[in-house]
Amino acid sequence: MSSAWKTPRGSDAMPEIMVKIIGSKHFQYLVEKPKIKENDSLKTETQTMHQKPMTDNARQMSRDTPVPINFTDQQTTDNPDDVKEKKHPENNQKSENNQKLLTGANSSRFLDGNIPSQANVHCSSVPTGDQSLSYVHGIPRRKLRDWSLEQMVRGSSDQPEDIGQSPSGTTNEDAFLLALVRRELKSRPLSSNLLEKLQKELKILDPISSGFLLQSQLSRLFLKHEVPLQLPTVKILCQRFSKRGSPEMVNYEKLLWFLNSAASDYPQQNKAAADLRKTESHGTHSQSTPPQHSSSQPEVNRSLLEILKMALRTTNGRLNIDNLNLSFRKEDRSFSGCLPLPKVRAICGKHGLYLTLSLLETLLNHQDLGYQNEIKWQNFVEMLTRASSDLLSDLPTGKNEKKAPAPPMEPEVPEMSQSKTEHMKTPEEELQPESSPAETSACKDPLKPLKIRPVSQPFVNPAVKNKAEECETWIDRFRKLENALYLCDLSNTGVLEKERARRLIHNYNLIYNLSLSPQKIDQALRRFRSGENMLLEPALRYLKEL
């Protein structure tokens, strides 16, 4: 192409704008082509088109300041045709003058002929005939962080006060988030009753006490209780307290704690507590609970003993604490003295002691029992022995006489278990204290000693208490159903497949004669389902209360 554009000595040369597209960008430069007589009419038209804006803008450029950066000067150095232009200094000088005029014409397309700051312009070369500013591209910036939260908080009047008081332990995001939540709670503050309702329903939605729920569940719950927070704020809160591995899971305990601190009237105490929460998240989860109970530790111990007494009353004296201790010792393979909550619950369930999730949380929050989301089983066994001894001392005199042979038989159990294996001796040890009182109290009926679990017979003498006996036996049979369902949950997740749970409940309903109607079973399955699974604890509680 350059050989065809050589200018003869006697011919006039006219500058022409050439445009190249390199990498989705337009680059223009000026070249001088010979003026051919055949195309005079075409060239005059193009010359008038280019020279009109040149002459108009030349006057404007004389008054305005020169353009700071000439983009065409940078591009002409890489053009191979410019090497030949350097041989003709007159033509080269003309092209430079025309080039300056063209850049001035292009600059007039911006506001009042001034090019905006060059940091915001990525390509300012002009394609031919383009009157829109589509050739101006913004420089691609690095996406640092989401400043929407900061801008929303800056719109409030009290934002500088909140940030000014933020201690060094809290980050700017936490300070902004705290200020944003407080600003939205000004018109309608959160009440303690609403927070308690939220906490109860969150625990129902989380039957295994994992501490995490889906963002959709939290959003629906907040809409249900009309929490005075906007949906973008709720989304930001969920992102702030989300799990590292799975961002859809939210730590609802920390979120509720944050809302409670934001709703209170003492910001300095809240931020000091936030610092404690920061340090707690790096360490253990249960280290912040002992100071809460340290002031009233004897009262907490007494209330915990009362709760354990209530749990022991449901066993009807069948719990052998020594066997329970041996099972805990066998399960503790690391000899740490601590076991997780699912294992503690499963072992206690095998021995006839059924612990609810609320009771397990109480044990975990106790100063002497909880450690790093695990339970110190040795201290738990000691507290169980204290509760059982207090329960025996609280019984009336008539029942003490009947239950008197039971305590001396307990120390015989470990002596027998030392000589034989633990697994073979556990059912025999449970049957020995049951058969001896059955023989003494009911010798008239020869078939009574052959029954598997005649637990309620030695304690019920009058015929008036037949209804109470039937209720106790129904509860025992229902506990067999509970134990079977929990044993099917091998991973201790607290949920079971809905169809499998339906089949098991119907089968055990017929086997143990529980008299549960199929409509009630279907209603429990529909009400307490999570996707294709069923939540075990609330469904069983619902069936038990029928």
From Swiss-Prot:
Pfam family, one: DUF5580_M
Feature: compositional bias, Basic and acidic residues: 81-93, 274-283
Biased composition (Low complexity): 284-298
Matching InterPro entries: DUF5580 (IPR040774), DUF5580_C (IPR049247), DUF5580_M (IPR049246), DUF5580_N (IPR048316), EF-hand-dom_pair (IPR011992)
Region (Disordered): 37-101, 269-300, 392-443
PANTHER family (UniProt xref): GENE 12695-RELATED (PTHR34830:SF1), SIMILAR TO HYPOTHETICAL PROTEIN MGC34837 (PTHR34830)
Name of the protein in question: Uncharacterized protein C1orf87
